[in-house]
C-alpha cells in the first residue's frame, strides 16, 4: 500500500507529474517529456517527473546568476535566518519527507528519519556558520601606515550534483553551505531519487528564499545536464557526490572554464580490529555502519581486517549476528535492511561474491539475491578467507557484503589498508592508545573512526583524499568551499 502524505503537493502529486523548479516557478519539459521513478522495494512506479532539456538548465543558470546579484548582498544575519526557517520547516514536514525517502530510496523508515533529521541539523549548523565568515586584518610589513585586509566573498552560481543514496542529506549539506556563503544554486538530483529533493526545495521556497536562488533540474540524462553545468562559464562552482569515474569526467569538463570544484567520490573503507578490543563490541559497531542503507554508503567498511588471534571468533560472532538481520520493505518496522537501489546493484554484489569464492573464500551466511521478492533485495552476506587478490579488495561493493581478511601485524595491515586508489574513510578498533594513534595517522584516508563507527555529522568537515576526491563538506570548512578570498591593501592617510 502506498503511503499517505499530509502534503502531497510537496512532491508534485497534485499535478500529472512532478516538475523542475526554475526562477521560482515549477516547470515541465516543453514537450511534456517525463521519466518514471520506481520503488526499489517493490518495482512499482511511484510517479512521473519532468524530463527537461538542457535549455531548461541554461535558463536555471541564467536565473541563478540574476538572483546572485541581489542575494550576495544579503547580510549574514538574513542568510542565517532563512536557513533556520528552512530547517524548522523540514522538521515540521518530517513525516512526509521520511515516507518519500523510504519510498524512492528503499531504506528503512528509522534510517530515513535519521537522514531527514540530519538535514535539519546541517542547515542549523550552516545558519550558525553564516555569521562566522570572517576575514582577517594585518599590518603591512612594508608600510607601517598600511593595513592588509582579507575579505571572503561568495564564489557565485554553484552547481550541486547529488546522489541517490543520501538524496535528502546531500541537498542540505551542499545547499546549506552554498546559501550560507551567499551563493545561488542549481541542484541536479539523481534520476532515481528526485522527489525528496523537490520536497526540500519547495520548503526552501516557503522559508522565503528569493526566486532564482535555488533551482532544481530533473532529468533522466544526467550526463547532458552535467556537461552544461560544468562547461557553462557562468557557473563558478561545482560540487559533486558520486562515483570516482563520473567525478573524473566532471572534473575534466570543469577544467574548460577553471571552476572551483569539490568532489566526494567512491570509497573502499578498511575496518581494522586488533585482538585487545572486545569482539562483541567490534561486531556491533561493524554491523551498524556496514548494513546501513543496505551497504550503499561511501564510508561503510568494504574490507574487514581482523587480527589472526581473534579472526575465527570475529567471523563466528559476525555470522551469527548477520543471521538475525531482517531484510524487507523499508515500511515494515521490523526491517533492518532494505533493498539495493537497482538490479545493477544486485549484479555487482553477486560478481564480488563469485570472484572471491572462485579464489578460495567461503560464504558463512547469505550469498544470494532474494529472488522471491519483486524488489532488489540481497541477503546480508559474510565472506571469510578473503585475500588481497580478490575484487572485494580493490573495488567498492556498495552492497550488504562483509569481506573478512586476516592479518598478522600492524605494519602489514596498514600496508593492505592503504593499497587502494581511493581514501575516504577508515576504522580502527583497539584499546592500545599508541596503536590507535599510529594507525589513524598512517591510514591514507580523510576520515577515521577510532573505536567508533561514526565519521559523519554536521560538526565534522567531511571529505576524502586520493581518488576519493577533495574539498570538505560540513564542519568549519564547509562554507569556505563556496567562498573566495580577496586581499585589499589599504593605505591610511
UniProtKB/Swiss-Prot annotation:
Principal location listed in the UniProt entry: cytoplasm
GO molecular function: succinate-semialdehyde dehydrogenase (NAD+) activity; succinate-semialdehyde dehydrogenase (NADP+) activity
UniProt keyword list: Cytoplasm, NADP, Oxidoreductase
GO cellular component terms attached to this protein's record: cytosol; mitochondrion
InterPro entries: Ald_DH/histidinol_DH, Ald_DH_C, Ald_DH_CS_CYS, Ald_DH_CS_GLU, Ald_DH_N, Aldehyde_DH_dom, Aldehyde_DH_Superfamily, Succ_semiAld_DH
Catalytic activity: succinate semialdehyde + NAD(+) + H2O = succinate + NADH + 2 H(+); succinate semialdehyde + NADP(+) + H2O = succinate + NADPH + 2 H(+)
Pathway: Amino-acid degradation; 4-aminobutanoate degradation
Active site: 264, 298
The enzyme's E.C. designation: 1.2.1.16
Keyword NADP included in the entry's annotation: yes
Job description of the protein: Catalyzes the oxidation of succinate semialdehyde to succinate. Can utilize both NAD(+) or NADP(+) as a coenzyme. Functions in the GABA shunt, which allows to bypass 2 reactions in the TCA cycle by removing alpha-ketoglutarate from the cycle and feeding succinate and NADH back into the cycle.
Family: Belongs to the aldehyde dehydrogenase family.
Assembly information from the UniProt record: Homotetramer.
NCBIfam families: SSADH
Name of protein: Succinate-semialdehyde dehydrogenase [NADP(+)] 2
Organism annotation: Schizosaccharomyces pombe (strain 972 / ATCC 24843) (Fission yeast)
